Amino acid sequence: MRVVVTGLGMINAIGDTVDESWNNCINGVSGIKEVRSIDTSECYAHMGAEASEKFDVDAGEDADRMDRVSLLCVKAVREAISDSKIEITEENADRVGVIIGSCVGGAVSIQKYFTDMEDGSDKADPKEIFKMPIGAIANNVAKIAGAKGVVTNVGNACAASTISIEYACDLIRAGVGDAFIVGGTDSFSALAFGGFTALHALDSDPCSPYNKSKGITLGEGAGALIIESYEHAVARGAHIYCDILGGGISSDAHHITAPRPDSEGQMNAMKWALKSSDLDAKSIDYINGHATGTPLNDSTEIQAMQNIFGENEGTSVDSTKSMVGHCLGAAGAVEAIYTIKALTTNTVPPTIGYSEEDLEALKEKAGKLDFTPNVKKEREINYAMTNNFAFGGNNASVIFSKHEKDIKPLENNRVFVTGMGLVNAFGNSVDSYIEGTKTGKAPVEGGSLHAEVGPEVYQEYGVKLAFYRKLDKLSQIQVVSGRACLKNAGVTVTEENQTDIGMIIGTADGPTTDIVNFHEGLIKNGLHEGSAFVFPNTVYNAAGGYLSINSGVKGVNVTLVNGMQAGLQSVCYAYNVVKNGTEKMMMACGVDENTDVIYSLYDRLGYVTENGDTKPYGFKGRQFVLGEGSTSVMLESEASAQERGAEKYAEIAGYGMAHESVSVGTIKGSDVALDKAVKAACESAGITPDEIDAIVGFGNGNKTVDAIEIGSYERIFGDDQKPVLSVKTLVGEARAAAATLEAAHAALLLAGKLDASQPAFLFENGKALETVVDTSSFENILVTSYAPGGSYTAVVLKKVK
């Protein structure tokens, strides 16, 4: 299936619109100036590429609930929608989705809230908490756009928005949606500036990528693209900019901040993009490089391009970061738009900043590559590539084409659960969880449940103590559950299979604890005194990066961020990757922590119970028991599982995702989206709702959440009540970890690993009736989850026969 681009929107340091920014870009106008938004007086570097301080944007009724990162994104999205002339109506909204990438999310709001807390807790507005997570961004966009399909965010740092483009293309080709609003956004923040200052990675002058390479210059902005199936675009008479062919996503498995010296991961992303596009290296006319301006990044990227494209005659390369700085999570989208404009106008933007002396030095490292120094170049461009690399060792490449091109059809593999790793309040193994289901709820401390991992666990899974100490708790529990998943699946990572295995990490709150810890250090000690030890752990994809480094897994590595259901969305994404043949095996993971910081934020919002008596489906208030953990589930193609002789716990039969926009921080009024997700999951699985035997639900004790869930089941199943099983009665509201655990619990039941007699809930007249059901004859189990803002995911697991 062809996927095409029909709309573009952008704001950055050299323009508030695509046209303004592009015209300045091709004319070599730099947006790098003295930083105005934060005080850098005590820092060694003072340059930045900031967007307009104030800009016109219609953000609707929730504008005051949005961080600058969302406002920048909404600005770009409004332009892209207008450019594409797409009309999102009640009739087509279910087939229109939103996927947005970001690195630091609502960092401005985090800084404000905790600065106010330092001055006195009564000054800190709890509403700022809703603006903080990356997960808020796509929800804000969906609300102003009216999109009701798949809605999520990608948290893979500086590769995030490139991955958002690739993920949306995958979903369109899988038939999940007709059109997507994709892109990325990040605002200028103390978090990023203080962090890169701590790493001494900033250039004190304007950055000079592929040239002096002394460091980066931070930028900010947003880029948005409307992408559609070709058939959908033609049917509405849309203007088509170009086709999106293939892409590649890889992991270095090397270092949390530094690229591999041999460029292997970067080359894998580029090679896989070429392979999935059915192109050879000689076909690429233009590459918009990642080109951050640091010595290691530039040298390894040049090495990678030389190895793949070095024999081409004059492949054009440039760094638009030389003008707009490094826009972090927005970089991929901004640079994709520049790449598309270059492709459609046959104009390569310049890489600015070369002196005559620099040009002489460039000849030695450029070889046959043309780095387009200082002046734009007009040339024929048929195929163009854009590359972005990130902390965590994540690499992403995507290829755009001026012309229609047939690419290899996707595979249609059956997908099975063949292993799992469980870290929660019951312990760190499948056996400890199974035993815990027999004894009931884990011990509650106040309103909390905690997962503990100690030295004996690290040793069991080959995690060295020196490595473990570098990790924040989120990464610690993810590494342990990931390693446990590989072991439980009987998988040994080798040079032969390391690129056949990947991972999708879902998280609601990500590394909030270390983000806050880093911010508090800046507040107390100054922007110039940030912790170089803590900063690398503030990116949402650090947990996946550390798991890759420790396990040696080098395949697809993506972090999804959209509330509690991110852990179940990870199952859907991983399912797609295996089903279409991109990877043989994928770990679908959900991870969230319960630290003092996390507890304080949920408690400030009034969500945490004080005594631990609150339980799902009690319908008494808005509070719940806060849990934590990490769940990793191995999804594997039928052919791979059979070749290995792997045990199959269950089959992933199908899934559905839907969204009904409500304000960030609530789900009240979003009921219909859960109905749609459940029905879509059943349809995808090839069954009717009547064939569902039981549900593993998401109720957590908040009466609004629980009532929406049960109301949906009553509408869908009517008098044919389905027993609802709950993992949150056992491990608390562990958010994304609980969502993935729901799928693991269903798989264990279908595989006969749990007792056939299971506690469950039935509902009558709005009340929950506790009962025990015999699960021995169950064939199909539905798993559901939710996210504040109105997103829902449903997955059907089927018994293996």
Where are the model-predicted features located?
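Conserved beta-ketoacyl condensing-enzyme motif
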Residues: V5, V29-N156, T185-F193, A281-N297, ...
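Flexible, low-complexity linker/loop segments at domain and module junctions
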Residues: M1-V5, I88-A93, S277-S283, N312-E313, ...
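Active-site-proximal alpha-helical scaffold in enzymes
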Residues: C73-K85, I134-A138, A142-A145, G149-G184, ...
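Acyl-CoA/ACP chain-elongation machinery
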Residues: R36, V176-K214, G247-P261, Y286-D298, ...
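ACP-dependent fatty acid/polyketide chain-elongation machinery
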Residues: M1-D62, S84, E231-Y241, I337-I352, ...
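Glycine-/small-residue-rich "gating" segment that lines the acyl/pantetheine channel
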Residues: E34, D119-D125, E166, D170, ...
